[in-house]
């Protein structure tokens, strides 16, 4: 597992977290801790680059959900049928069909936008 970060600028400063390797029960704690450390250091808008992630397990799904909640803060009091619950602070990049399918099947695509490349994700902020 290799995790690196870069800074890019769109309308706001965006931290891109590049993840290389599988996200599963053996790697998720390390991965989540590294990303949470980035948030604790002041990063507010994140792109998780999953283009080099070959496998995303249920542990990885829980991690993404936790990061969504961390960046969202206090949950809104009501459900929003218009999709306003999508995260304005966390975007994903996934070019592998296997990982994209997991995002769709798990329903994470309802709360997290994902893009085909980092440039598109950064430009979405």
Residues of each region from the PLM?
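STAS-typified acidic loop motif
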Residues: 1-33, 50-55
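Amphipathic alpha-helical interaction surfaces in cytosolic regulatory modules
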Residues: 25-111
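Short acidic-hydrophobic, aromatic-tinged amphipathic segments that line or gate anion-handling sites
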Residues: 112-117
């Amino acid at each position: 597992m290799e995790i690196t970060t870069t800074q890019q600028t769109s309308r706001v400063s965006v931290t891109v977290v590049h993840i290389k390797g599988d996200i599963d029960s053996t790697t998720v704690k390390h991965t989540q801790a590294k990303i949470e450390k980035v948030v604790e250091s002041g990063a507010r808008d994140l792109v998780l680059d999953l283009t080099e992630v070959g496998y995303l397990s249920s542990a990885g799904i829980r991690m993404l959900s936790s990061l969504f909640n961390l960046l969202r803060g206090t949950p809104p009091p009501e459900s929003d049928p218009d999709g306003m619950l999508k995260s304005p602070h966390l975007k994903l990049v996934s070019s592998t069909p296997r990982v994209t399918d997991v995002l769709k099947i798990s329903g994470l695509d309802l709360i997290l936008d994902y893009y085909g490349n980092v440039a598109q994700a950064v430009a979405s902020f």
